[in-house]
Amino acid sequence: RIANAFIEQSEFDLAIATYEKGEKLMKGQFHFTYNLADLYRRKGETLTMLKYYVDGLEDGSINSMSLQNVLAAYLEPDKHKDLRALLYEKLESKPDFIPIIEILQWTFIQSKDFLNALRQAKALDKRTGENGSRVMYIANIAANEGDYKTAIDGYGYIKNLGQSGGYYLEAYR
């Protein structure tokens, strides 16, 4: 409530201090990473905002789909590089953390870098055993955007999974 009162008065620094104090008092039992990220967004501090959003993925206070929606609405395309740098940094300590890989894949899609998006999709597919659903998604986007080389690569991956994969026949179309 106190932080919200500060936000209503556009006193973002006081709201930030309130959330930070709340986290200390809660001793890690509750995280305000999403709230802090939003406040830094309002202040125009993009790098700090991104850091908190990525931390929110890690502490579970935000999921990758929600973060994609927020980033689509508020992140300028020229800041995707900064986000990728944070994601790669986080992946060094948590290479199998799927939400980070999902956001990384999303940044490549937004930048129309379908080859790197496909690489991430393949990595996720191998880790999760999803039978190619993410790969098929990226391959279809690449084909629709005219990146046929990447699309063919994705469809080839699906074909190599064999007929037991749910997208085998669709990959042949």
Feature map (PLM): residue ranges:
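Acidic, polar-rich low-complexity tracts and alpha-helical solenoid repeat scaffolds
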Residues: 1-173
